[in-house]
Amino acid sequence: MLKSPYSGGHLEVIVGPMFSGKSEELIRRVTRALIARQRVQVFKPAVDDRYHESAVASHAGRTVGALAVGDVADIRAHLSGEAPLLQASAEMPDVIGIDEVQFFGPELVPLALELADAGVRVILAGLDLDFRAEPFGCMPDLLARAESVEKLTAICTQCGAPATRSQRLISGEPARFDDPVVLVGALESYEARCRLHHVVTR
């Protein structure tokens, strides 16, 4: 679909564990919007610099240009034209994509709603659960308010079943429940696991 099936602005949320293809799906949707000659702007948290500083990148290596921002205030400033250092937008995009939304604060929720109310297609991708399998950041609120939700699964590294959890590993061992929630990493720190094989040390 070049156009979303929803008329006017709306929220699309893509969730799942690490290695489930969330960024890949965001890139796919954004690329289709670009082919359809829609105005598109993609944002990513500056803290996520694993693969590329100025692009959303999938684990498979696909990329789409993105603006790295420190927080939601930076997104607002860019969209309002008050952020010369962030290449302020001349006009409101038709489509806004935001990757790794779990790293943004709760103020992302009202911004996403405002954008949708203004007629923007907002595509949000991120983890729904943290490494402890607890709801992650602002994602539960976004899921409740979205018109469209796609929950992806990965493959459990232990048994090959569909994986819905992100297993954090520290020196090869499961992380402790009271470890910091945010730890940016990839294969060196995380594995996809099913419910049965997801382990959190207490």
From Swiss-Prot:
Positions bound to Zn(2+): 156, 159, 194, 197
The enzyme's E.C. designation: 2.7.1.21
Keywords: ATP-binding, Cytoplasm, DNA synthesis, Kinase, Metal-binding, Nucleotide-binding, Transferase, Zinc
UniProt subcellular location: Cytoplasm
Residues that hold ATP according to the record: 16-23, 99-102
Gene Ontology biological-process annotations: DNA biosynthetic process; thymidine metabolic process
GO MF annotation terms: ATP binding; thymidine kinase activity; zinc ion binding
NCBIfam families cross-referenced by the UniProt entry: PRK04296.1-1
Protein name: Thymidine kinase
Organism: Deinococcus deserti (strain DSM 17065 / CIP 109153 / LMG 22923 / VCD115)
Gene of this entry: tdk
